[in-house]
C-alpha cells in the first residue's frame, strides 16, 4: 500500500526524476477522479493502472473511494491490487469538489460509451473548465468501454474545448487523436438529440 501526502508532490522542482513526476501525475489524477463524483461510494474510474506486472501493462482500472468526511482518498487497481491512500489533497488544484451545476427541468442526463483511447485523450486536454473536468474524471470503466454521463449542454461544452485544442495543436498525431475524440463526442451528442 502506497501511503502519500499529495502536498509533497504539488510543486516538484524542474530536476525531479521522471518516476517522481509520473507518480505525481497519477496521484493527481486519482484525486481528480475521487473528487469529481460523489463521496461515500467506491467506484471504478476510467483511470488505467500504471503498473507493469511481468513487464506487461496491467489491464486494470483504478477503483477510488472518498469517505463523506474528507480526510483521505483510498485507491486500488481492480486487477493487480496495487493501491494506496492519499492525504493532503483538500484545496489542491486537483480537488474538483464543487456544488453541482443546477439543471433545467427538461435536461436529461444520458450515459454514452466511448473507447478507452478517447477517454485518455479527454484527460489530456489542457484547457477545460471545472465542470468539463469533473465530467471527464467521473467517467466509469465498464467491459464495453468508458461511460461518460452528461446532458446535452455539458457534452456540447466539452466538444468546444476538444475542437479548440485540436485546431491549435501543432503535433499532427495528437491532432488526429483529438479529432477522433471530437468525432466520438459528436456522435454521442447527435444520438442524444434524436
Specify the residue positions occupied by each region the protein language model found.
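Flanking scaffold residues of small Cys/His-coordinated metal-binding clusters
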Residues: 41-50, 71-72
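Short recognition patches in nucleic-acid-associated and regulatory proteins
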Residues: 48-68
Amino acid at each position: 500500500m502506497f501511503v502519500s501526502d499529495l502536498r509533497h508532490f504539488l510543486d516538484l522542482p524542474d530536476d525531479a526524476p521522471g518516476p517522481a513526476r509520473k507518480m505525481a501525475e497519477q496521484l493527481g489524477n486519482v484525486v481528480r477522479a475521487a473528487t469529481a463524483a460523489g463521496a461515500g461510494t467506491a467506484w471504478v474510474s476510467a483511470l488505467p493502472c500504471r503498473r507493469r506486472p511481468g513487464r506487461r501493462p496491467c489491464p486494470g482500472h483504478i477503483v477510488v473511494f472518498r469517505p463523506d468526511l474528507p480526510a483521505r482518498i483510498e485507491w486500488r487497481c481492480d486487477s493487480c491490487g496495487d493501491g494506496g491512500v492519499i492525504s493532503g489533497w483538500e484545496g489542491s488544484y486537483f480537488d474538483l469538489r464543487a456544488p453541482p451545476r443546477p439543471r433545467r427541468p427538461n435536461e436529461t442526463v444520458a450515459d454514452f460509451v466511448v473507447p478507452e483511447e478517447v477517454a485518455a485523450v479527454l484527460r489530456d486536454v489542457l484547457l477545460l473548465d471545472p465542470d468539463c473536468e469533473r465530467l471527464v474524471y467521473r467517467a466509469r470503466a465498464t467491459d464495453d468501454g468508458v461511460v461518460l454521463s452528461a446532458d446535452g449542454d455539458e457534452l456540447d461544452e466539452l466538444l468546444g474545448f476538444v475542437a479548440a485544442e485540436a485546431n491549435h495543436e501543432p503535433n499532427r498525431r495528437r491532432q488526429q487523436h483529438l479529432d477522433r475524440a471530437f468525432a466520438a463526442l459528436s456522435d454521442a451528442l447527435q444520438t442524444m438529440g434524436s
